[in-house]
A protein has these predicted regions:
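Short, flexible helical or helix-coil boundary motifs
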Residues: 17, 183, 187, 372-375
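Intrinsically disordered, low-complexity polyampholyte segments enriched for Lys and acidic residues
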Residues: 34, 84-89
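Preferential activation on post-signal-peptide N-terminal prodomains/segments
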Residues: 61, 65-72, 78, 90-317, ...
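Segments that shape or occlude catalytic/ligand-binding pockets
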Residues: 258-409, 413-421
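C-terminal soluble interaction/assembly domains
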Residues: 400-408, 414-455
Length: 455
Protein backbone atom coordinates (compact mmCIF):
# COMPACT_ATOMS: atom_id res chain seq x y z
CA UNK A 1 0.00 0.00 0.00
CA UNK A 2 1.03 3.60 -0.31
CA UNK A 3 2.70 4.31 2.03
CA UNK A 4 2.94 1.44 4.35
CA UNK A 5 3.64 3.59 7.38
CA UNK A 6 0.79 6.07 6.90
CA UNK A 7 -2.12 4.13 8.40
CA UNK A 8 -2.52 4.75 12.08
CA UNK A 9 -4.95 1.85 12.26
CA UNK A 10 -2.14 -0.69 12.56
CA UNK A 11 -4.54 -3.58 12.98
CA UNK A 12 -5.70 -3.11 9.37
CA UNK A 13 -2.30 -3.24 7.71
CA UNK A 14 -1.28 -6.41 5.89
CA UNK A 15 1.51 -8.05 7.89
CA UNK A 16 3.59 -8.32 4.76
CA UNK A 17 4.06 -4.55 4.88
CA UNK A 18 4.36 -3.58 8.53
CA UNK A 19 7.82 -4.81 9.46
CA UNK A 20 9.39 -1.39 9.18
CA UNK A 21 6.53 0.32 11.01
CA UNK A 22 6.31 -2.21 13.84
CA UNK A 23 9.12 -0.73 15.88
CA UNK A 24 9.66 1.76 18.67
CA UNK A 25 9.21 5.29 17.24
CA UNK A 26 12.52 6.72 16.15
CA UNK A 27 13.96 10.14 15.56
CA UNK A 28 12.36 12.21 12.84
CA UNK A 29 13.21 10.86 9.40
CA UNK A 30 13.99 12.78 6.28
CA UNK A 31 11.35 14.06 3.85
CA UNK A 32 11.19 10.73 2.06
CA UNK A 33 8.96 7.95 3.35
CA UNK A 34 9.11 4.24 2.66
CA UNK A 35 6.41 2.84 0.40
CA UNK A 36 6.93 -0.76 1.38
CA UNK A 37 9.27 -2.91 3.37
CA UNK A 38 11.78 -2.81 0.54
CA UNK A 39 10.60 0.18 -1.48
CA UNK A 40 13.27 2.55 -0.19
CA UNK A 41 16.32 0.64 0.83
CA UNK A 42 20.02 0.18 0.53
CA UNK A 43 20.26 -3.56 0.01
CA UNK A 44 22.85 -6.26 0.11
CA UNK A 45 21.59 -9.50 -1.41
CA UNK A 46 23.03 -12.91 -2.06
CA UNK A 47 22.35 -16.59 -1.92
CA UNK A 48 23.29 -17.87 1.50
CA UNK A 49 26.78 -18.87 0.43
CA UNK A 50 27.62 -15.67 -1.48
CA UNK A 51 29.57 -12.79 0.03
CA UNK A 52 27.85 -9.42 0.44
CA UNK A 53 28.95 -5.89 -0.36
CA UNK A 54 30.13 -4.22 2.86
CA UNK A 55 27.94 -1.44 4.22
CA UNK A 56 29.53 1.99 4.33
CA UNK A 57 30.94 2.97 7.69
CA UNK A 58 30.65 -0.39 9.43
CA UNK A 59 33.72 -1.28 11.88
CA UNK A 60 5.38 -18.05 -9.92
CA UNK A 61 6.45 -19.03 -7.77
CA UNK A 62 7.61 -22.13 -5.96
CA UNK A 63 5.22 -24.65 -4.47
CA UNK A 64 4.81 -24.47 -0.69
CA UNK A 65 2.12 -24.39 1.93
CA UNK A 66 1.65 -20.75 1.04
CA UNK A 67 3.60 -19.91 -2.09
CA UNK A 68 1.56 -21.32 -4.94
CA UNK A 69 0.75 -20.39 -8.49
CA UNK A 70 -2.58 -19.04 -9.63
CA UNK A 71 -4.78 -21.17 -11.84
CA UNK A 72 -3.43 -21.45 -15.40
CA UNK A 73 -5.31 -19.87 -18.28
CA UNK A 74 -7.12 -22.00 -20.87
CA UNK A 75 -4.33 -21.56 -23.40
CA UNK A 76 -1.76 -22.66 -20.81
CA UNK A 77 -3.74 -25.81 -20.08
CA UNK A 78 -3.77 -26.73 -23.78
CA UNK A 79 -0.01 -26.70 -24.06
CA UNK A 80 2.70 -27.12 -21.46
CA UNK A 81 5.48 -26.74 -24.02
CA UNK A 82 7.95 -24.01 -23.01
CA UNK A 83 8.34 -21.01 -25.28
CA UNK A 84 11.56 -21.07 -27.26
CA UNK A 85 13.87 -18.26 -26.14
CA UNK A 86 14.16 -15.43 -28.63
CA UNK A 87 17.62 -14.83 -30.01
CA UNK A 88 17.12 -11.78 -32.23
CA UNK A 89 19.41 -8.81 -31.73
CA UNK A 90 18.05 -5.69 -30.02
CA UNK A 91 17.79 -3.87 -33.34
CA UNK A 92 15.73 -6.70 -34.80
CA UNK A 93 13.47 -6.66 -31.80
CA UNK A 94 12.83 -2.95 -32.21
CA UNK A 95 11.87 -3.29 -35.89
CA UNK A 96 9.76 -6.43 -35.48
CA UNK A 97 8.21 -5.84 -32.06
CA UNK A 98 4.91 -4.34 -33.19
CA UNK A 99 4.29 -7.07 -35.80
CA UNK A 100 5.07 -9.80 -33.28
CA UNK A 101 2.83 -8.26 -30.63
CA UNK A 102 -0.10 -7.89 -33.01
CA UNK A 103 0.16 -11.45 -34.33
CA UNK A 104 0.78 -13.28 -31.06
CA UNK A 105 -1.25 -11.33 -28.49
CA UNK A 106 -4.33 -10.03 -30.29
CA UNK A 107 -6.62 -11.46 -27.59
CA UNK A 108 -5.10 -9.48 -24.71
CA UNK A 109 -7.34 -6.86 -23.15
CA UNK A 110 -6.02 -3.36 -22.66
CA UNK A 111 -4.84 -2.43 -19.18
CA UNK A 112 -5.75 0.68 -17.22
CA UNK A 113 -2.74 1.74 -15.16
CA UNK A 114 -3.76 2.14 -11.49
CA UNK A 115 -3.35 5.51 -9.81
CA UNK A 116 -0.30 5.96 -7.62
CA UNK A 117 -1.10 6.57 -3.96
CA UNK A 118 1.70 7.79 -1.75
CA UNK A 119 0.08 8.66 1.57
CA UNK A 120 2.17 11.21 3.46
CA UNK A 121 5.50 12.42 2.14
CA UNK A 122 6.86 10.91 -1.05
CA UNK A 123 8.62 7.74 -2.05
CA UNK A 124 12.36 8.06 -1.96
CA UNK A 125 15.51 7.04 -0.11
CA UNK A 126 18.99 8.22 0.83
CA UNK A 127 22.35 6.51 0.38
CA UNK A 128 25.95 7.61 0.37
CA UNK A 129 26.44 6.38 -3.19
CA UNK A 130 24.09 4.77 -5.69
CA UNK A 131 26.60 1.93 -6.19
CA UNK A 132 25.75 0.81 -2.64
CA UNK A 133 22.08 0.61 -3.50
CA UNK A 134 21.17 -3.05 -3.92
CA UNK A 135 17.77 -4.55 -3.12
CA UNK A 136 18.44 -8.12 -4.17
CA UNK A 137 16.31 -7.88 -7.32
CA UNK A 138 17.03 -10.91 -9.56
CA UNK A 139 16.01 -8.99 -12.70
CA UNK A 140 18.73 -7.73 -15.01
CA UNK A 141 18.51 -5.96 -18.39
CA UNK A 142 20.38 -8.91 -19.93
CA UNK A 143 17.47 -11.30 -19.29
CA UNK A 144 15.79 -12.53 -22.48
CA UNK A 145 12.25 -11.60 -21.47
CA UNK A 146 9.71 -10.60 -24.12
CA UNK A 147 6.54 -11.00 -22.05
CA UNK A 148 5.55 -10.94 -18.38
CA UNK A 149 2.24 -11.83 -16.73
CA UNK A 150 -0.34 -9.26 -15.65
CA UNK A 151 -2.90 -10.04 -12.94
CA UNK A 152 -6.12 -8.68 -11.55
CA UNK A 153 -5.52 -8.20 -7.82
CA UNK A 154 -7.98 -10.25 -5.78
CA UNK A 155 -6.85 -8.41 -2.64
CA UNK A 156 -7.72 -4.98 -4.07
CA UNK A 157 -9.63 -2.69 -1.70
CA UNK A 158 -12.02 -0.45 -3.69
CA UNK A 159 -12.68 1.67 -0.59
CA UNK A 160 -9.00 2.75 -0.81
CA UNK A 161 -8.69 2.41 2.95
CA UNK A 162 -5.93 -0.15 2.50
CA UNK A 163 -7.91 -2.91 4.22
CA UNK A 164 -6.73 -6.46 3.46
CA UNK A 165 -9.34 -8.30 1.38
CA UNK A 166 -9.64 -11.63 -0.38
CA UNK A 167 -9.95 -14.76 1.73
CA UNK A 168 -13.03 -15.50 3.80
CA UNK A 169 -12.90 -16.27 7.51
CA UNK A 170 -13.19 -20.00 6.81
CA UNK A 171 -10.42 -19.91 4.20
CA UNK A 172 -8.13 -18.13 6.63
CA UNK A 173 -8.86 -20.76 9.27
CA UNK A 174 -7.92 -23.44 6.74
CA UNK A 175 -4.63 -21.63 6.14
CA UNK A 176 -3.95 -21.56 9.86
CA UNK A 177 -4.44 -25.32 10.02
CA UNK A 178 -1.88 -25.81 7.23
CA UNK A 179 0.64 -23.56 8.96
CA UNK A 180 0.08 -25.27 12.30
CA UNK A 181 0.76 -28.64 10.67
CA UNK A 182 3.89 -27.32 8.96
CA UNK A 183 5.30 -25.86 12.17
CA UNK A 184 4.21 -28.81 14.29
CA UNK A 185 1.89 -26.67 16.42
CA UNK A 186 -1.45 -27.38 18.05
CA UNK A 187 -4.14 -24.70 17.74
CA UNK A 188 -5.74 -23.94 21.10
CA UNK A 189 -8.13 -21.14 20.11
CA UNK A 190 -8.86 -18.65 17.31
CA UNK A 191 -10.04 -15.05 17.17
CA UNK A 192 -11.31 -13.14 14.12
CA UNK A 193 -10.62 -9.46 13.44
CA UNK A 194 -13.35 -7.70 11.44
CA UNK A 195 -13.27 -4.52 9.39
CA UNK A 196 -13.69 -1.40 11.47
CA UNK A 197 -16.64 0.92 11.19
CA UNK A 198 -14.85 3.26 8.74
CA UNK A 199 -15.25 0.83 5.86
CA UNK A 200 -18.97 0.46 6.54
CA UNK A 201 -19.43 4.24 6.63
CA UNK A 202 -17.53 4.62 3.35
CA UNK A 203 -20.02 2.37 1.59
CA UNK A 204 -23.01 1.20 3.68
CA UNK A 205 -23.76 -1.46 1.05
CA UNK A 206 -20.44 -3.15 1.73
CA UNK A 207 -20.70 -6.35 3.72
CA UNK A 208 -18.34 -6.28 6.68
CA UNK A 209 -15.60 -8.86 6.14
CA UNK A 210 -12.95 -10.59 8.21
CA UNK A 211 -9.53 -8.93 8.05
CA UNK A 212 -7.56 -11.68 9.73
CA UNK A 213 -7.88 -14.75 11.92
CA UNK A 214 -5.41 -15.28 14.75
CA UNK A 215 -4.69 -18.62 16.41
CA UNK A 216 -3.18 -19.19 19.83
CA UNK A 217 -1.04 -22.33 19.72
CA UNK A 218 1.19 -24.29 22.06
CA UNK A 219 4.23 -22.67 20.42
CA UNK A 220 3.19 -19.10 19.71
CA UNK A 221 0.68 -17.13 17.65
CA UNK A 222 -0.29 -17.75 14.02
CA UNK A 223 -2.14 -15.17 11.96
CA UNK A 224 -3.68 -15.50 8.49
CA UNK A 225 -4.60 -12.26 6.71
CA UNK A 226 -7.38 -11.87 4.14
CA UNK A 227 -4.91 -10.67 1.50
CA UNK A 228 -3.07 -13.99 1.55
CA UNK A 229 -0.17 -13.24 3.87
CA UNK A 230 0.41 -15.01 7.16
CA UNK A 231 2.69 -14.66 10.16
CA UNK A 232 4.09 -16.68 13.02
CA UNK A 233 5.10 -15.12 16.35
CA UNK A 234 6.97 -17.79 18.31
CA UNK A 235 7.11 -18.05 22.08
CA UNK A 236 10.06 -16.33 23.72
CA UNK A 237 11.85 -19.66 24.11
CA UNK A 238 11.48 -20.49 20.42
CA UNK A 239 12.35 -16.94 19.35
CA UNK A 240 15.70 -16.80 21.12
CA UNK A 241 18.73 -17.03 18.81
CA UNK A 242 21.84 -19.04 19.80
CA UNK A 243 24.91 -17.31 21.17
CA UNK A 244 26.98 -15.59 18.52
CA UNK A 245 24.08 -14.27 16.42
CA UNK A 246 23.14 -10.63 16.10
CA UNK A 247 19.70 -9.61 14.83
CA UNK A 248 19.05 -5.87 15.10
CA UNK A 249 17.83 -3.08 12.85
CA UNK A 250 20.68 -0.60 13.15
CA UNK A 251 23.71 -2.11 14.87
CA UNK A 252 24.15 -5.36 12.91
CA UNK A 253 26.83 -5.52 10.22
CA UNK A 254 26.23 -7.04 6.79
CA UNK A 255 28.27 -10.10 7.76
CA UNK A 256 26.33 -10.56 11.00
CA UNK A 257 23.02 -10.04 9.20
CA UNK A 258 23.79 -12.68 6.59
CA UNK A 259 24.90 -15.10 9.31
CA UNK A 260 21.58 -14.59 11.10
CA UNK A 261 19.64 -14.97 7.85
CA UNK A 262 21.49 -18.21 7.14
CA UNK A 263 20.41 -19.54 10.54
CA UNK A 264 16.78 -18.45 10.10
CA UNK A 265 16.74 -19.84 6.56
CA UNK A 266 17.99 -23.20 7.77
CA UNK A 267 15.29 -23.16 10.43
CA UNK A 268 12.28 -22.09 8.35
CA UNK A 269 12.87 -22.21 4.56
CA UNK A 270 12.17 -25.92 4.15
CA UNK A 271 9.08 -25.74 6.38
CA UNK A 272 7.74 -22.90 4.21
CA UNK A 273 8.55 -24.67 0.96
CA UNK A 274 11.44 -22.58 -0.38
CA UNK A 275 13.57 -24.75 -2.66
CA UNK A 276 16.51 -22.42 -3.29
CA UNK A 277 16.30 -19.61 -0.72
CA UNK A 278 17.98 -16.30 -1.50
CA UNK A 279 18.71 -14.01 1.44
CA UNK A 280 18.40 -10.23 1.28
CA UNK A 281 19.32 -7.73 3.96
CA UNK A 282 18.63 -4.12 3.22
CA UNK A 283 17.74 -0.80 4.74
CA UNK A 284 17.93 2.95 4.40
CA UNK A 285 19.21 5.94 6.36
CA UNK A 286 17.47 8.68 8.26
CA UNK A 287 18.93 12.14 7.91
CA UNK A 288 21.04 11.61 11.03
CA UNK A 289 22.85 8.87 9.11
CA UNK A 290 21.32 6.04 11.13
CA UNK A 291 20.90 2.80 9.18
CA UNK A 292 17.62 0.87 9.44
CA UNK A 293 17.88 -2.75 8.31
CA UNK A 294 15.30 -5.33 7.26
CA UNK A 295 15.66 -9.05 6.50
CA UNK A 296 13.86 -11.33 4.04
CA UNK A 297 14.28 -14.38 1.81
CA UNK A 298 12.63 -15.52 -1.41
CA UNK A 299 12.83 -18.62 -3.60
CA UNK A 300 15.45 -18.43 -6.35
CA UNK A 301 14.39 -21.71 -7.99
CA UNK A 302 12.72 -21.80 -11.39
CA UNK A 303 12.80 -19.88 -14.64
CA UNK A 304 13.76 -16.22 -14.82
CA UNK A 305 10.08 -15.28 -14.86
CA UNK A 306 9.27 -17.49 -11.86
CA UNK A 307 12.14 -16.04 -9.83
CA UNK A 308 11.00 -12.49 -10.66
CA UNK A 309 7.50 -13.37 -9.46
CA UNK A 310 8.88 -14.99 -6.30
CA UNK A 311 10.94 -11.90 -5.52
CA UNK A 312 8.07 -9.48 -5.99
CA UNK A 313 5.11 -11.45 -4.65
CA UNK A 314 6.32 -14.29 -2.43
CA UNK A 315 8.68 -13.41 0.39
CA UNK A 316 9.38 -14.47 3.94
CA UNK A 317 10.27 -11.52 6.15
CA UNK A 318 11.89 -11.68 9.58
CA UNK A 319 11.25 -9.01 12.22
CA UNK A 320 13.62 -8.42 15.12
CA UNK A 321 12.56 -8.11 18.74
CA UNK A 322 15.51 -5.82 19.29
CA UNK A 323 13.43 -3.36 21.27
CA UNK A 324 11.29 -5.76 23.29
CA UNK A 325 9.77 -3.65 26.07
CA UNK A 326 12.32 -0.88 25.59
CA UNK A 327 11.09 2.70 25.35
CA UNK A 328 14.02 4.00 23.31
CA UNK A 329 17.40 3.07 21.81
CA UNK A 330 19.18 3.17 25.17
CA UNK A 331 17.13 0.23 26.49
CA UNK A 332 17.10 -2.03 23.45
CA UNK A 333 18.73 -5.45 23.30
CA UNK A 334 22.29 -5.69 22.01
CA UNK A 335 21.74 -8.96 20.14
CA UNK A 336 18.02 -9.09 19.39
CA UNK A 337 15.77 -12.10 18.83
CA UNK A 338 13.05 -13.14 16.39
CA UNK A 339 9.83 -11.25 16.99
CA UNK A 340 7.89 -12.81 14.11
CA UNK A 341 8.20 -14.05 10.56
CA UNK A 342 5.70 -13.20 7.84
CA UNK A 343 5.07 -14.91 4.53
CA UNK A 344 3.37 -13.10 1.66
CA UNK A 345 1.87 -14.33 -1.59
CA UNK A 346 -0.19 -11.80 -3.48
CA UNK A 347 -0.70 -14.28 -6.33
CA UNK A 348 -2.84 -16.60 -4.22
CA UNK A 349 -5.77 -14.28 -4.91
CA UNK A 350 -4.73 -12.99 -8.33
CA UNK A 351 -6.45 -13.68 -11.64
CA UNK A 352 -4.03 -13.91 -14.55
CA UNK A 353 -5.05 -11.64 -17.43
CA UNK A 354 -2.34 -12.86 -19.77
CA UNK A 355 1.32 -12.62 -20.74
CA UNK A 356 1.90 -9.11 -22.06
CA UNK A 357 4.73 -7.93 -24.32
CA UNK A 358 7.18 -5.73 -22.44
CA UNK A 359 9.41 -2.89 -23.54
CA UNK A 360 13.11 -2.59 -22.72
CA UNK A 361 14.53 -0.52 -19.88
CA UNK A 362 15.98 1.89 -22.45
CA UNK A 363 12.57 2.37 -24.08
CA UNK A 364 11.08 3.00 -20.64
CA UNK A 365 13.77 5.57 -19.87
CA UNK A 366 12.93 7.42 -23.07
CA UNK A 367 9.29 7.50 -21.98
CA UNK A 368 10.28 8.81 -18.55
CA UNK A 369 12.38 11.61 -20.02
CA UNK A 370 9.50 12.55 -22.32
CA UNK A 371 7.21 13.00 -19.31
CA UNK A 372 5.48 9.63 -19.10
CA UNK A 373 5.37 7.79 -15.80
CA UNK A 374 4.20 8.08 -12.21
CA UNK A 375 5.82 9.49 -9.09
CA UNK A 376 4.93 10.97 -5.72
CA UNK A 377 7.94 13.32 -5.86
CA UNK A 378 6.61 16.88 -5.30
CA UNK A 379 6.53 19.37 -8.20
CA UNK A 380 9.12 21.67 -6.66
CA UNK A 381 11.81 19.10 -7.54
CA UNK A 382 13.20 19.20 -11.10
CA UNK A 383 11.98 16.67 -13.65
CA UNK A 384 14.21 13.64 -14.34
CA UNK A 385 17.00 14.07 -16.87
CA UNK A 386 19.40 11.61 -18.48
CA UNK A 387 22.03 12.74 -15.97
CA UNK A 388 19.89 12.38 -12.84
CA UNK A 389 18.48 8.91 -13.64
CA UNK A 390 21.04 6.71 -11.89
CA UNK A 391 19.42 3.30 -11.43
CA UNK A 392 16.65 1.20 -12.95
CA UNK A 393 15.07 -2.14 -12.12
CA UNK A 394 11.95 -4.07 -13.06
CA UNK A 395 9.40 -4.58 -10.29
CA UNK A 396 5.74 -5.26 -9.61
CA UNK A 397 3.87 -2.88 -7.32
CA UNK A 398 1.78 -4.73 -4.74
CA UNK A 399 -0.73 -3.92 -2.03
CA UNK A 400 -4.44 -3.44 -1.42
CA UNK A 401 -4.51 -0.23 -3.48
CA UNK A 402 -3.22 -1.84 -6.71
CA UNK A 403 -6.23 -3.00 -8.74
CA UNK A 404 -4.00 -4.49 -11.45
CA UNK A 405 -0.62 -6.13 -10.79
CA UNK A 406 1.71 -5.40 -13.68
CA UNK A 407 5.45 -4.93 -14.20
CA UNK A 408 6.97 -1.46 -14.03
CA UNK A 409 10.42 -0.08 -14.55
CA UNK A 410 11.39 1.70 -11.37
CA UNK A 411 13.82 4.59 -11.85
CA UNK A 412 15.84 6.08 -9.01
CA UNK A 413 16.40 9.75 -9.76
CA UNK A 414 18.95 11.92 -7.97
CA UNK A 415 17.33 14.86 -6.20
CA UNK A 416 18.96 18.18 -5.27
CA UNK A 417 20.65 18.25 -1.87
CA UNK A 418 18.60 19.74 0.94
CA UNK A 419 19.84 20.58 4.41
CA UNK A 420 17.16 18.51 6.15
CA UNK A 421 17.90 15.33 4.19
CA UNK A 422 21.36 14.44 5.50
CA UNK A 423 23.34 16.18 2.76
CA UNK A 424 25.74 17.55 5.36
CA UNK A 425 26.60 13.92 6.21
CA UNK A 426 27.25 13.06 2.58
CA UNK A 427 23.89 11.36 2.05
CA UNK A 428 22.36 11.66 -1.41
CA UNK A 429 18.59 11.75 -1.85
CA UNK A 430 16.71 9.93 -4.59
CA UNK A 431 13.10 10.02 -5.75
CA UNK A 432 11.32 7.03 -7.27
CA UNK A 433 9.55 7.12 -10.66
CA UNK A 434 7.59 4.35 -12.40
CA UNK A 435 7.01 3.63 -16.09
CA UNK A 436 4.75 0.69 -17.09
CA UNK A 437 6.83 -2.11 -18.58
CA UNK A 438 4.09 -3.44 -20.84
CA UNK A 439 3.88 -2.19 -24.42
CA UNK A 440 1.96 1.06 -24.95
CA UNK A 441 -0.57 -0.50 -27.34
CA UNK A 442 -1.94 -2.51 -24.41
CA UNK A 443 -2.39 0.53 -22.14
CA UNK A 444 -5.54 2.67 -22.13
CA UNK A 445 -4.07 5.53 -20.11
CA UNK A 446 -0.29 5.87 -20.38
CA UNK A 447 0.39 7.98 -17.26
CA UNK A 448 1.99 11.40 -17.62
CA UNK A 449 4.05 12.89 -14.81
CA UNK A 450 3.00 16.47 -14.17
CA UNK A 451 4.06 16.59 -10.54
CA UNK A 452 2.31 15.81 -7.28
CA UNK A 453 0.41 12.53 -7.10
CA UNK A 454 -0.22 12.24 -10.79
CA UNK A 455 -1.95 9.35 -12.49
Amino acid sequence: MNGNDFLDKMELIDLAYVEAADKVPKKKRAAWLKWGAVAACLCVAAAIVVAVVPQRGEPQPSESIHLGTTAPSESERESDAPTEPKTEKPSERETEATTERNSDTVSLEKITIPDLYAGFGFEGFAVYDISEYRRGNPWSPDMDLTTLPVYRNGAYDPSRAGVPRGFTEEEMKEQLERYADAFGLTILSTETKWENVYVKLHDPRTERKAVWVEAQTDGGVLRAVASGSASYTPTRERARLPEGYRFTYSSTTDEEAMKTLAYLTELYADVLGLVQPVAVTCGDYDYYGKFDRIYFIYDGAGTAEEVILNYNFCRVGFASDEYGDAKDDSEKSEAGSLRYLSQSNTLLLAEKLGDYPIISAEEAKELLLSGCGQSSVPPDYPAPTAETVEHVELIYRIGALEEVLLPYYRFDVRLPDKSNCGAELGLKSYGVYYVPAIAAEYITNMPTYTGWFNS
